[in-house]
Amino acid sequence: MRVAASLTLVLALLLAGCGSSDEGATGASASKASSSGYVDWPLFGRVPARTHYLPRQERALDPPLKQAWSINTHALIEFPPAIHDGVAYVINKYGNGKAVRLRDRKVLWELNVRPSDKGNPNFVTGPVYYRGAVYGAFLSGHLAAGDAKTGKKLWVRKLNAHLESSPLAVDGTLYLGTDTTDVLALRASDGKTRWSFNAPGAIKASPSYHDGNVFAADYESSAFALDAKTGKPVWRTNTSKVPPYGHGGFFSSPAIAFGRVYAARDDGTVFAFDEQTGKVAWSFDAGDYVYGSPAVARVPGTPPSVYIGAENGRFFAIDARTGKPRWRYDVGGPVPGTATVIGHTVYTSSFKTQETTGLDARTGKRTFHIKQAGYTPMVSDGKRLFLVGYYDLIGLEPK
């Protein structure tokens, strides 16, 4: 069990801004550049449906790539940086953060916060920007909000739970899960509770949102959809009671696209649920533990696909409609984290080999390789790519 962060560390996030907006399911409607020419990657999964996909018709961001620079954060980066209007906000596991202007690597903000226990991480979730405010959740149970421009504290709330679930913000409401089995909806302006839903098991994954519903999955085999305004259940599917599946906990966050909800249990079973009813549309056995979340994309020239890796080192492209494998690539080591799809390339990584690999989304052929690795391997501001290493944020440019 990781030691909880102190309130002092909670306030560290308030100096780190990031960006977001309410966006479509796959990301296709959210890939337009801002007036400055940048595309935002404002939260874990990039869009509220958490598809981990940045569409690009052109191949300007595809390999070959070259390393342009590297910034060391001096500790593990559990979550990728949030990117808003050309600035990346990077926070390591101890709550120490930097705000980096990506075009010239100028550090706009830098935090030097000492952990309450140097042997244990304090910050474990991804921050989110919403309507001028920055929100972040901490393992200690603290949820904090700050002004995105100034870093001034807006509010802090202590929940009686541990938090490993990254917040989500939609329509003035924050959504997150707790280890005390609750899905919470909090008023973004002051952190007060709008509603709570008690699930059968702990919520370790992050909730997702699409078309008026919040989707989550727990550690007691259940996936469910809730009305985002009221918290009332729309559907719930206990996968342990659906033959032939036994018990398995959901550690991965749901991704919503193409009328389906995609999520993986830690026993290696990848599920597709009907978005409206929760009925199991198909399942796929990855052959080993799965801890990462699925990336879902319709890349030009390919059918809608789910991309996910397992502890056995196998990485799969699965047809999102049928659950049949399109191709498989052997990474060479366990895949503990979540893939991302940028343009025509899907990126995955392995801590054991300390390698990040780029694969052609259509064929599975390797097109990129570098000796750096993190949980979520790559993000982008629409102009460049940024590799998330174990300690480093690495800027990559087309050759």
Please annotate each region the language model reported.
Residues 19-22:
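Bacterial signal peptide processing site
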Residues 38, 45, 68-82, 107-130, ...:
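Extracytoplasmic beta-rich repeat domains
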Residues 101-105, 147-150, 187-191, 227-230, ...:
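Short loop/turn segments that connect beta-strands within beta-propeller blades
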Residues 32-67:
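Blade/loop signatures of beta-propeller domains
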Residues 14-17:
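C-terminal motif of bacterial Sec signal peptides marking the signal peptidase cleavage site
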Residues 1-7:
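Bacterial N-terminal signal peptides that target proteins for export
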Residues 42, 88-90, 98, 133-136, ...:
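Conserved beta-propeller blade signature
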